[in-house]
């Protein structure tokens, strides 16, 4: 499959190259003066600045980390709808669809844990991960890129700057601060989207608001067998609301964000259930405000004070036991009704901090920062369609379902071998966590061609212990167009509240108060070289993980039920190569290709070969983009001596997309997008153990739309 994809790429390059030689030299109008990485010269590309690597602005070529950047114009040209789409075009990284609630990110051959908690996600520099599961994908699923100015990605450790969860990656999403625009779009599977951006200035004050709504009716999927042997059909309708606000006066900046997602039906992680009646769904809401005050203390010292806070609510519902079996083992009256279950999680976070940069001399900068963070989740109760009033009146003897459409809050036993109790059995009790941290970093230019960065961060989690993270890098630029980097970084992930304090045995899982943080030591070497109109980058990495947290089966806590608990399971090593080629054939045509090969990966669930490609051609008013990615074979389930006779492998596939944009005037644009251009049917790996064949992906989707600037 990979060689077939490469042959297609070569053929397209040949065809497009011929047409480019005859094409006009005129450029697509850039009415908003946005940077377009796919159309920059190689020299301009090297001078693009980033802030994610050191929290100070610096050219990407000299950043002390492996960094990938996508800016607004690239996002528009390539047709990325959400963050998960974009991550498939970052070297060493790809995104897998997991269940109804969203996707999971795999970085450098390593799965990133529950709700991708091995990656730190920042929104305008503010922490986006939540305390319950430790990651961001639970409440930032399918994060829209409509109002995003740029996305910066660290491929590798970032804990020496950012603390916990920045273990194998950091993503910073920066929203737009200016623009006046209306967007409308429609498409197949009932897709609809409408949004606007409005910016106003009042003397020294600048303010903007963005609002966007999108929905679709979902794709229809072929029936499949779930854990209980049922042959079922499903869909995957989605709804999304995004609202962002920006306010700036002098040195004070406020960013606000509201995100609402409802992803329904599809497949549940509890038994691999599909559904067509909204019994399976995930609904997430998140509101955040981030306040920042910048002080120019002196010509050599800049300090930022910040206050970040976010509130979130996650609602999840699933079929627990299908009706046929529930009538026998759950319902006292033998009702032919599904046993439903779920929960609602509410939480909040407050963070106060200071970051600064002190220019000691022309060639030496000292960066520093400290922060306090309080994370809190409310009591996490079980929701189900059990008649609790009848359960209480019968002292636990009768367990019948409620009428259709009704549910109760609270679990009191009486089923699954768990004795009835008048006291509610919580999934997680109300819990709070306090964290203190601080870092210091030195950036020293030893000469015109060599720079040295060293940094150290200390974090103290009141419940799970403390951690010290070190980083060091040397960047050598012997001549224009050549960059050599050597990097070492330590990173960690503190156990989440869910892992540490635990869900009760009623759910088949319990927490582990003895968990230690999982850690990683990473070594990287990279070389970037310009050859005429071509830039080639090659990166080698080696990750040594310690105390990795995994879910393991333990002795029965409740007789007759399987019980699972997170444990520190020891060591793991991943290593591999990332290659990226950027080729500028002419002023109008550019290509970008990335191939990553991992010689050591997680044993199950990670592809050893991935690739991506993007071809962009533009004239004065037209822009054509063809892009795609390749995923190698994935071992989804290993054989054992008892029940699994053979390994299960998910086959490789190539996924293609296309987008055409036409600038009618400087203010009005129309476009068309095709996702999964060749309408291929394929599956990707999921952690749902009951579905070793993987979960299905969407068929071809066509969208058309317009952007109107005013």
Which residues make up each language-model segment?
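Short acidic/polar hinge/loop motifs at secondary-structure boundaries
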Residues: 127-155
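Periplasmic-side early beta-strands and strand-to-turn transitions of outer-membrane beta-barrels
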Residues: 160, 172, 179-180, 185, ...
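Gram-negative outer-membrane beta-barrel transporters
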Residues: 445-452, 540-544, 561-639, 673, ...
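Conserved C-terminal beta-signal and adjacent last beta-strands/turns
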Residues: 199-201, 241-243, 248, 282, ...
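Outer-membrane beta-barrel signature, preferentially recognizing the C-terminal barrel domain
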Residues: 275-296, 427-433, 477, 483, ...
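N-terminal periplasmic accessory domains that precede
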Residues: 83-86, 103-108, 119-124, 138-141, ...
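Extracytoplasmic beta-strand/coil segments of soluble accessory domains associated
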Residues: 51-52, 56-67, 84, 88-127
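Face-selective signature of the C-terminal outer-membrane beta-barrel domain
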Residues: 246-262, 283-466, 477, 537-538, ...
């Amino acid at each position: 499959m990979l060689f077939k994809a490469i042959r297609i790429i070569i053929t397209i390059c040949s065809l497009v190259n011929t047409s480019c030689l005859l094409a006009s030299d005129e450029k697509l109008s850039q009415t908003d003066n946005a940077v377009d990485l796919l159309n920059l010269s190689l020299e301009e590309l090297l001078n693009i600045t980033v802030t994610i690597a050191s929290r100070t602005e610096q050219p990407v070529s000299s950043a002390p980390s492996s960094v990938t950047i996508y800016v607004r114009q690239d996002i528009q040209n390539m047709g990325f709808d959400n963050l998960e789409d974009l991550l498939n075009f970052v070297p060493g990284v790809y995104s897998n669809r997991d269940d109804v609630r969203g996707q999971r990110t795999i970085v450098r051959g390593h799965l990133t844990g529950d709700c991708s908690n091995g990656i730190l996600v920042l929104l305008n520099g503010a922490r986006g991960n939540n305390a319950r599961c430790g990651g961001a994908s639970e409440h930032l699923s399918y994060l829209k890129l409509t109002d995003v100015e740029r996305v910066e990605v660290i491929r590798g450790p970032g804990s020496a700057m950012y603390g916990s969860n920045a273990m194998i990656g950091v993503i910073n999403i920066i929203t737009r601060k200016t623009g006046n625009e209306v967007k409308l779009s429609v498409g197949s599977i009932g897709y609809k989207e409408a949004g606007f951006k409005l910016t106003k200035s009042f003397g020294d004050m600048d303010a903007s608001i963005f609002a966007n709504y999108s929905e679709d009716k979902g794709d229809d999927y072929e029936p499949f067998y779930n854990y209980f042997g049922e042959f079922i059909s499903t869909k995957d309708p989605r709804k999304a609301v995004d609202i962002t606000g920006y306010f700036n006066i002098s040195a004070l900046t406020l960013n606000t964000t509201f995100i609402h997602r409802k992803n329904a039906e599809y497949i549940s992680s509890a038994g691999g259930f599909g559904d067509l009646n909204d019994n399976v769904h995930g609904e997430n809401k998140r509101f955040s405000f981030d306040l920042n005050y910048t002080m120019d203390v002196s010509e050599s010292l800049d300090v930022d004070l910040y206050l970040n806070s976010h509130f979130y609510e996650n609602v999840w519902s699933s079929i627990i036991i299908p009706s046929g079996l529930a009538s026998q083992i759950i319902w006292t009256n033998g009702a032919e009704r599904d046993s439903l279950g779920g929960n609602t999680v509410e939480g909040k976070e407050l963070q106060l901090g200071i970051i600064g940069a002190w220019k000691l001399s022309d060639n030496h900068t000292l960066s520093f920062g400290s922060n306090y963070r309080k994370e809190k989740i409310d009591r996490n109760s079980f929701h189900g369609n059990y008649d609790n009033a009848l359960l209480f009146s019968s002292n636990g003897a009768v367990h019948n379902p409620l009428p259709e459409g009704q549910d109760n809050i609270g679990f009191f036993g009486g089923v699954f071998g768990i004795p009835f109790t008048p006291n509610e059995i919580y999934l997680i009790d109300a819990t709070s966590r306090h964290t203190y941290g601080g870092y210091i970093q030195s950036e020293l230019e030893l000469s015109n061609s060599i720079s040295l960065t060293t940094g150290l961060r200390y974090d103290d989690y009141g419940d799970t212990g403390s951690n010290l993270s070190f980083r060091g890098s040397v960047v050598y630029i012997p001549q224009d167009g050549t960059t050599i980097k050597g990097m070492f970084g330590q990173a960690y992930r503190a156990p989440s509240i869910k892992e540490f304090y635990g869900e009760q045995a009623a759910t088949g899982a319990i927490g582990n108060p003895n968990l230690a943080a999982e850690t990683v030591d990473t070594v990287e070497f990279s070389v970037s070289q310009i050859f005429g109109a071509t830039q080639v980058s090659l990166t080698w990495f080696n990750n040594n993980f310690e105390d990795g947290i995994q879910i393991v089966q333990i002795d029965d806590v409740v007789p007759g039920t399987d019980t699972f608990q997170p444990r520190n399971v020891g060591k793991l090593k991943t290593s591999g190569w990332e290659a990226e080629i950027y080729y500028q054939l002419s002023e109008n045509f550019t290509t970008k290709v990335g191939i990553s090969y991992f010689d050591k990966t997680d044993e199950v669930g990670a592809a050893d070969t991935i690739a991506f490609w993007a071809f962009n051609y533009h004239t004065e008013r037209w822009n054509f983009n063809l892009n795609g990615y390749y995923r190698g074979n994935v071992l989804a389930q290993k054989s054992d001596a008892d029940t699994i006779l053979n390994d299960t492998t998910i086959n490789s596939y190539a996924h293609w997309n296309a987008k055409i944009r036409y600038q009618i005037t400087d203010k009005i644009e129309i476009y068309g997008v095709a996702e999964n251009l060749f309408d291929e049917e394929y599956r990707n790996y999921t952690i749902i153990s009951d579905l070793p064949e993987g979960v299905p992906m969407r068929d071809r989707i066509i969208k058309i739309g317009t952007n109107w600037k005013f």
